[in-house]
Amino acid sequence: MITKEEAQKIAKLARLKFEKDIVEKFSTQLSTIMNMINILNEIDCKDIEPLTSVSNMNARMREDTVTSSDLSNKLFDNVSGNSARLAKEVKYFITPKVVE
């Protein structure tokens, strides 16, 4: 059983603030969760194969092909506004000042 003091310490570490009447409920809930975890820890899983996929479907694989291309022209085609021409020339995005 998790005590009220332990529950308050856990809440403080998690940067949570509870009213005094909620701390008891919190400690009860944490105790329940810890009991569930202890039950799971007692299960013998030595002979069970680890699950590698939730579905039995095989992933479709494709060959990786290396291509060399300069996508910057396509990227800067999407720039609009007054700075579009300059952005395409210098190959930088021009944004409004965000830091003083």
Curated annotation (Swiss-Prot):
Cite the Pfam families for this sequence: GatC (PF02686)
Query: Which keywords fit this entry according to its UniProt record?
Result: ATP-binding, Ligase, Nucleotide-binding, Protein biosynthesis
On whether Ligase is a keyword of this UniProt record, the answer is yes
Record flagged with keyword Phosphoprotein? no
Gene Ontology terms: biological process: regulation of translational fidelity; translation
**EC number of the protein:** 6.3.5.-
Alphabetized InterPro entries for the sequence: Asp/Glu-ADT_sf_sub_c (IPR036113), GatC (IPR003837)
**Catalytic activity as recorded in UniProt:** L-glutamyl-tRNA(Gln) + L-glutamine + ATP + H2O = L-glutaminyl-tRNA(Gln) + L-glutamate + ADP + phosphate + H(+); L-aspartyl-tRNA(Asn) + L-glutamine + ATP + H2O = L-asparaginyl-tRNA(Asn) + L-glutamate + ADP + phosphate + 2 H(+)
Please provide, alphabetically and separated by semicolons, the GO molecular function terms listed in this UniProt record: asparaginyl-tRNA synthase (glutamine-hydrolyzing) activity; ATP binding; glutaminyl-tRNA synthase (glutamine-hydrolyzing) activity
Q: Which HAMAP family match?
A: GatC
Q: What does this protein do?
A: Allows the formation of correctly charged Asn-tRNA(Asn) or Gln-tRNA(Gln) through the transamidation of misacylated Asp-tRNA(Asn) or Glu-tRNA(Gln) in organisms which lack either or both of asparaginyl-tRNA or glutaminyl-tRNA synthetases. The reaction takes place in the presence of glutamine and ATP through an activated phospho-Asp-tRNA(Asn) or phospho-Glu-tRNA(Gln).
By sequence similarity, the record places it as follows: Belongs to the GatC family.
Mind telling me which NCBIfam families this protein's record contains?
Answer: gatC (TIGR00135)
Subunit info here reads: Heterotrimer of A, B and C subunits.
Q: Would you tell me the protein name for this molecule?
A: Aspartyl/glutamyl-tRNA(Asn/Gln) amidotransferase subunit C
Give the taxonomic lineage as stored in the record: Bacteria, Pseudomonadati, Pseudomonadota, Alphaproteobacteria, Rickettsiales
